[in-house]
Amino acid sequence: MQHVFIVGSKGIPGAYGGYETFVDKLTQYHQDHTQLRYHVACKDTTVGEEIYHNARCFHIKVPNIGPAQAIYYDIAALADCCRYIENNKIEKPIVYILACRIGPFMAHYVRKIHKLGGLVFVNPDGHEWLRAKWPAPVRKYWKISEQLMTKHADLMVCDSKNIESYIRENYAAFAPATTYISYGAETRKSALADDDEKLLSWYAERDLTAKGYYLVVGRFVPENNYETMIREFMKSDTERVFAIITNVNDKFLEELEEKLHYKEDPRIKFVGTVYDQELLMKIRENAYGYFHGHEVGGTNPSLLEALGCTELNLLLNVGFNREVAEEAALYWSKEPGDLANLIHKADQMSQEEITVLGEKAKQRIADAYSWQFIAAEYEKLFLEAFQ
């Protein structure tokens, strides 16, 4: 039996960010596996254990200490893993750490886990130190943390080829062992019908209609280029609306209003968040087009979901996005007027042209990003780790 300890997601089941969805899908696809046993750290206000998808979910009590919570949580979870491995005499465990938050403490825990006969794998996420939401000292910490985790890990598991190249080139002095396994996405359609009451009432409350809107779904942070997308949409001549599904940050929203006066354009609609996955999938399917402005990070879950659901995708032209979508999308730059022109072109496209792009997008997901495929890649990685 290969025991795998996963540290760094908020836990399962729960409100899903990228890592949480990944852990949920991995344990779901492997729940009947006879040779893999998962132990998943879960951030909580109490301690305890439960079984979910046949994984042992162990709760780590985290005090409310502001931004340092994430670092405290990972360290406490690693300490718990070490205790459990030792007490239960588990042979050859794998500890898989998601994100690079605990670099200064990494050497200590790697030594400890090696002493217990285990290996430490790290998923480096995507350039956390570049994210504009962090103040300069925090960004500096993330960069140092990434460096130290790369130095001490037995293997860096990168969910994007761009991230893998970056790790190899920037940390060549450490000669890091790396491998590439992407994030995944669903390839099925939503379970909701076009006339489902839940969908129709969501549309009615927000004055939206199927194929009458362009869509974006994502975290409301500057590096996702909301400013460019809203500005360009306001410049465009489209009669469709721009529906923005996000957890609004008032400070950033005020900044955008000050710069763009978007409230004067009735086509710009902030429509709240949607945590019902079937409803969100249906909203994606019914969008005329999807905008993706993410500029920082590896393989983005929201982009994969868009390619799996929406036929017409308009993506910011950066390496990460091209790597994922290839020829299955249209691309825009941050040059003034570029996205506005692309929206005009998109509005003029025939249904046949849109269908061809949609089929390419779904095929791309099925070929390289389905959860079934990703789970099989991880199975191979974990079961062959000690060979």
Regions inferred by a protein language model and the residue ranges of each:
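Short hydrophobic beta-strand element within catalytic cores of glycosyltransferases
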Residues: 308-315
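Acidic donor-binding loop of glycosyltransferase active sites
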Residues: 282-298, 311
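Glycosyltransferase donor-sugar binding loop
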Residues: 42-46, 185, 217, 241-256, ...
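A short, active-site helix/loop in glycosyltransferases that binds the activated sugar's phosphate group
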Residues: 150-178, 182-190, 199, 225, ...
